[in-house]
Amino acid sequence: MNKVMTAREAIDLIQDNMTFAFTGFVSFGLPEDLLITLEEKFINEGSPKNLSLFYDAAPGCREAHGGNHLAHRGLIRRIHGGHLDLNRKLAALCSENAMPVFMVPQDVNTHLLRAIAGGEPGIVTKIGLKTYADPRQDGCRANQAAWDCGETEIGRAHV
């Protein structure tokens, strides 16, 4: 397999109901071409759809870039992220409860990406205890749809 591909070739690998993960902080390290290509493919072909979105930080630039390209009903079915303010269009859909949204502390997301890349099953951390991230409190649920889905992104381990 060729290690270099176009944005379209990469997006064509994404199928309906998959998890799409990307990173970037504001516009640094942001795969803008991939996000634009994903948006265009969804608008023109209706696929891929119902993606779970995973990002670690704050990928966007208020109105026009980053996660804002993914703000289309039917494209995203669930969000696990670190910050929504820089993705205003996506945040608006979240406020409308268009999908469950879980806002997990950025450092937890970063460590989780590293663990997944290393073949680990997950991470154990004290980060977020006694805050909204604590599974005994809000469990990172950021909207009513997250409560209504009956799931959470995190759990509590007894050691």
Outline where the language-model segments fall.
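Conserved alpha/beta enzyme-core scaffold
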Residues: M1-R156
